[in-house]
Amino acid sequence: MRLPIFLDTDPGIDDAVAIAAAIFAPELDLQLMTTVAGNVSVEKTTRNALQLLHFWNAEIPLAQGAAVPLVRAPRDAASVHGESGMAGYDFVEHNRKPLGIPAFLAIRDALMRAPEPVTLVAIGPLTNIALLLSQCPECKPYIRRLVIMGGSAGRGNCTPNAEFNIAADPEAAACVFRSGIEIVMCGLDVTNQAILTPDYLSTLPQLNRTGKMLHALFSHYRSGSMQSGLRMHDLCAIAWLVRPDLFTLKPCFVAVETQGEFTSGTTVVDIDGCLGKPANVQVALDLDVKGFQQWVAEVLALAS
């Protein structure tokens, strides 16, 4: 039986790979997509997501979400993904539009209609998920779990300690981590290992139309290089759904720093239980890299 999922995303070049896997992995049933401001503005992430759905002829509803964080000014990652978020490939024109309601309400409505609890996957800032949990707490029993790409038990990637998706809206992340729902966190500890090698990248143009498109996007992606390999951060959240055996997880108490002058957005991961607080997150700490690379090759071969 395929696993029903809703995907909250901010495309973003590595998001495009994660979306491909969510659509084409035979184990998954992608039923709803929502967008959030993150890598670029929400208008751009929505445009990019619709372009990808049209490219794959995927009839999946999409709702546009939060344009700004809960409290603070927005930040982006255009330096990594380019000003448009997905530069490098000329997508054809289409007339697709997002749903006419905000993302968190679209998630609420879809959860309440679902015949069974649904897994939420968030690979951008957690603003939409925080709005859902704070404004619609009645939805919690209908959430099977939340799988996120975000955070780190060690170094950050936009500050010394903070990972971008959490740092972009720390208050939202803090709300989500306090919510009591089941959370799996695929942070930089594993995503920095999730590298597609130059040898594999060179085969993409011959793979299929998706391979050609992704190869064009990757030439503008600044999380590594075509010569040294590219990190597929967001793809790890999808990989865990399909191949949890590739990941080493540990239950930990995790809090999000929202006040620190130098540490705002840091995920404080209590690996050794120093704080004496009960675990609220399953934290991915290690990855079977070769197994991950093999799985990526298999799923992208299906993305025709």
UniProtKB/Swiss-Prot annotation:
Keywords: Glycosidase, Hydrolase
Activity regulation field: Subject to catabolite repression.
Keyword flag Hydrolase: yes
Active-site residue numbers: H233
Any one GO BP annotation for this protein: purine nucleobase metabolic process
GO function terms (MF aspect): adenosine nucleosidase activity; inosine nucleosidase activity; purine nucleosidase activity; ribosylpyrimidine nucleosidase activity; uridine nucleosidase activity
A Pfam family reported for this protein in Swiss-Prot or TrEMBL: IU_nuc_hydro
PROSITE patterns recorded: IUNH
Enzyme class: hydrolase
InterPro entries, A to Z: I/U_nuclsd_hydro_CS (IPR015910), Inosine/uridine_hydrolase_dom (IPR001910), IUNH (IPR023186), Nucleosid_hydro_RihC_nonspecif (IPR022976), Ribo_hydro-like (IPR036452)
CC per GO annotation: cytosol
Keyword Hydrolase (UniProt): yes
UniProt EC number: 3.2.-.-
Family, similarity comment: Belongs to the IUNH family. RihC subfamily.
Further remarks about this protein from its record: Strictly specific for ribonucleosides.
The protein's role, per its UniProt record: Hydrolyzes both purine and pyrimidine ribonucleosides with a broad-substrate specificity with decreasing activity in the order uridine, xanthosine, inosine, adenosine, cytidine, guanosine.
UniProt protein name: Non-specific ribonucleoside hydrolase RihC
Species whose genome carries this gene: Escherichia coli (strain K12)
